[in-house]
Design a protein with these regions (language model features):
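Extreme N-terminal tail/first-helix region
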Residues: 1-16, 75
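Charged, gly/pro-rich active-site loop segments
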Residues: 1-4, 78-141
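Hydrophobic alpha-helical segments typical of transmembrane helices
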Residues: 5-9, 55, 97
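Alpha-helix boundary recognition
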Residues: 13-15, 60-61, 119
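Short beta-strand segments
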Residues: 18-51, 59, 65-69, 78-80
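A short beta-turn/loop motif at secondary-structure boundaries
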Residues: 28-30, 73-75, 116-120
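Glycine-rich nucleotide phosphate-binding loop and flanking beta-alpha elements
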Residues: 46, 53, 132-134
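Short, surface-exposed beta-strand-loop junctions and turns on beta-sheet-rich folds
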Residues: 53-55, 74
């Protein structure tokens, strides 16, 4: 089984601006998937979401989630992280993570702007702590 400490997994997850597809459960038990911007920090995948969004409410109710990141061109591949979400509303952590995520996806020149917009009260920092990591880097061979 792969892990987030594996350099190949980390390189795959952090390359460019690949979007994660977050899987979680609605209150009815129905599976849902939504795109998220994320960063890798230590042993977790980290993203922000609103406390009162479907994602925020669902993860507060049931922290089980999975996040899949894929390569949509040859040689095709993916990393799937299954785990438990930990939620934080700490203002300093919100601003720091929102700014880091913005730097990855919007560029350093707009990081502060988007960090201030997204790192505000009512938002959550979500840390997906892996229970299982699956990785396939070349699906053509």
């Amino acid at each position: 089984m792969a892990s987030l400490s594996d350099p190949a997994v980390r390189e795959f997850l952090t390359r460019g601006t690949r979007t994660g597809k977050l899987g979680y459960l609605a209150a009815s038990g129905r599976p849902l998937v939504t795109p998220v911007w994320f960063i890798v920090e230590a042993d977790s995948l980290v993203f922000n979401t609103g406390k009162d969004t479907a994602k925020g409410r669902a993860l507060a109710r049931d922290p089980r989630a999975s996040l899949c990141v894929d390569l949509e061109e040859p040689p095709f591949g993916f990393v799937q992280v299954q785990g438990e979400a930990e939620l934080s509303e700490d203002p300093a952590e919100l601003l720091r993570t929102a700014t880091a995520i913005a730097a990855r996806y919007m560029g350093a020149e707009r990081a502060e702007e988007f960090g201030k917009r997204n790192g505000v009260p009512g938002e959550l920092v979500v840390r997906l702590r892996p229970v299982k990591v699956l990785a396939v880097f070349d699906m053509t061979g």
